[in-house]
């Protein structure tokens, strides 16, 4: 089975320091992959580099092409703190942004675009908020709207940067269920994640990062106390796996 994402010797430099170094991995279809690591490990940088939003050295192939040629096939949900929630835009217009790549220049959204927007809003339980300003919503509701935008895009790959941070339990459950459904349909999903207590529940594969690639593979093989300790290097209070709890340099 051909990889949908192939990264080889990827490095990113910021002025006088190296953010990530010599990252190599491949990801196939139908996987939900958690990107784990301490603050400053380069998780968001790695995601942005794959998406072509950061300059890098090395090679990145998405669907066997450079990312610039497959942007329609990629949906990206950035961190909430990277979004201007005060910008005056309606919920339905935010979701319609997911259709922009499919709408020809100087053309209006068609019936199919509007149908997909409505269906996406219903999937996240936000159809009754379609005419509300995005800034009026709670954090969880805002995140659901951006997930709806990603759904409307009808992509093959989904990249989400800390989608579960600062949201309510209902929104978390809805988002997780939708992501798992997408995975089961053969989509590939990358998630920057920080809550180690839910890794086994959320992910099939984990990519453990601390400027360099520490480990990558199935959760059962890679998500171990040894790999967690090596990844977090004392920046973690507890590691939880099923009934096992390990204290790491408290």
Swiss-Prot record:
<dbReference type="InterPro" id="IPR050153">
    <property type="entry name" value="Metal_Ion_Import_ABC"/>
</dbReference>
<dbReference type="GO" id="GO:0005886">
    <property type="term" value="C:plasma membrane"/>
</dbReference>
<feature type="domain" description="ABC transporter">
    <location>
        <begin position="5"/>
        <end position="236"/>
    </location>
</feature>
<dbReference type="GO" id="GO:0016887">
    <property type="term" value="F:ATP hydrolysis activity"/>
</dbReference>
<protein>
    <recommendedName>
        <fullName>Manganese transport system ATP-binding protein MntB</fullName>
    </recommendedName>
</protein>
<feature type="binding site">
    <location>
        <begin position="37"/>
        <end position="44"/>
    </location>
    <ligand>
        <name>ATP</name>
    </ligand>
</feature>
<keyword id="KW-0472">Membrane</keyword>
<keyword id="KW-1003">Cell membrane</keyword>
<keyword id="KW-0813">Transport</keyword>
<dbReference type="InterPro" id="IPR003593">
    <property type="entry name" value="AAA+_ATPase"/>
</dbReference>
<keyword id="KW-0547">Nucleotide-binding</keyword>
<comment type="function">
    <text>This protein is probably a component of a manganese permease, a binding protein-dependent, ATP-driven transport system. Probably responsible for energy coupling to the transport system.</text>
</comment>
<dbReference type="Pfam" id="PF00005">
    <property type="entry name" value="ABC_tran"/>
</dbReference>
<dbReference type="InterPro" id="IPR017871">
    <property type="entry name" value="ABC_transporter-like_CS"/>
</dbReference>
<dbReference type="GO" id="GO:0005524">
    <property type="term" value="F:ATP binding"/>
</dbReference>
<dbReference type="InterPro" id="IPR003439">
    <property type="entry name" value="ABC_transporter-like_ATP-bd"/>
</dbReference>
<keyword id="KW-0067">ATP-binding</keyword>
<comment type="similarity">
    <text>Belongs to the ABC transporter superfamily.</text>
</comment>
<dbReference type="InterPro" id="IPR027417">
    <property type="entry name" value="P-loop_NTPase"/>
</dbReference>
């Amino acid at each position: 089975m051909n990889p949908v994402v192939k990264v080889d010797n990827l490095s990113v430099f910021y002025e006088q320091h190296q953010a990530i170094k010599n990252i190599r991995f491949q990801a196939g279809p139908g996987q939900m992959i958690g990107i784990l690591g301490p603050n400053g490990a380069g998780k968001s940088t790695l995601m942005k580099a794959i998406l072509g939003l950061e300059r890098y050295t090395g090679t990145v192939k998405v669907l066997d092409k450079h990312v610039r040629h497959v942007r329609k096939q990629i949906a990206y949900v950035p961190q909430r703190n990277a979004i201007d929630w005060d910008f005056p835009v309606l919920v339905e217009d935010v979701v319609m942004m997911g259709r922009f790549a499919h709408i020809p220049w100087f053309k209006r959204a068609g019936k199919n675009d509007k149908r997909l927007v409505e269906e996406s809003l219903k999937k996240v339980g936000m159809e009754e908020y379609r005419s509300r300003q995005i800034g009026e919503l709670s954090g969880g509701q805002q995140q659901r709207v951006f997930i709806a935008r990603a759904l409307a895009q009808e992509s093959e790959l989904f990249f989400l940067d800390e989608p579960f941070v600062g949201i309510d339990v209902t929104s978390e459950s809805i988002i997780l269920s939708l992501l798992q459904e997408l995975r089961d349909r053969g989509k590939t999903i990358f998630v920057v994640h920080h809550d180690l207590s839910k890794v086994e529940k959320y992910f099939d594969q984990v990519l453990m990062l601390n400027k360099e690639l520490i480990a990558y593979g199935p959760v059962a093989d890679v998500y171990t106390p040894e790999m967690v300790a090596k990844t977090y290097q004392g920046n973690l209070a507890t590691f939880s796996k099923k009934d096992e709890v390990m204290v790491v340099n408290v």
